[in-house]
Amino acid sequence: MPNIAPDWRDSHPRKSVLIDGVRMQYVETGQEHKPPVVFLHGNPTSSYLWRNIISHVADSRRCLAPDLVGMGDSERPPNGEFTFADHAHYLDRWFDALNIENAVLVVHDWGSALGFNWAQRNPDKISGLVYMEALVQPLTWKDWPENAKAVFQAMRSEAGEEMVLQKNIFVERILPASVIRELTDQEMSIYRKPFLDPGESRRPTLTWPRQIPVDGEPEDVTTIIQSYGTWL
């Protein structure tokens, strides 16, 4: 039986590519001439999320896992914004730059929304979808548990600046509370790395909850998710 114990280390080869002046980092490993499996992370993680999964796929597939802009080791876009549209733009160019075809997408959290959106627009380039904790339809506040609703409503208000940009709530509280085991100190240090400095370095983790399509807002994200939800 294969060893599936979690490993805090990430020894997979890393590369980078310049996308519209922004350097995006990504893992690429496995069988170069085999069909690709693309792993897309969400908030507030990075390609590091997939380190243990990739190890079990790399013997038979080409494995790729980008860091979204402003997250992991990827650079920030010059406009300093991290809307769904911004992430989709850079990810589209990343797919083009790496000539991704016949791909299986493995997606989590906001990586699911980005992956579904790309797949809907590029159906001839995918062979499968694997998703977890995914955004498959717009939400209403009635869908939320009361404790989570209060937190996410606060993040969509001025209070979110203090909660996320100063207190780093997504990394320090929400991330470890979302994992069924205790994250190690080494793992936490890697997840903290892009967001060590209070303020704008943490902006991606605040913009994401403000992009969740709740009660029709934001309108553009709601439309996108309604569209790919129907397509799925």
PLM feature spans:
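Flexible "cap/lid" subdomain of the alpha/beta-hydrolase fold that forms the substrate-access gate
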Residues: 2-30, 36, 44, 49, ...
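Typically the conserved alpha-helix immediately C-terminal to a functionally engaged Cys/Sec
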Residues: 51-56
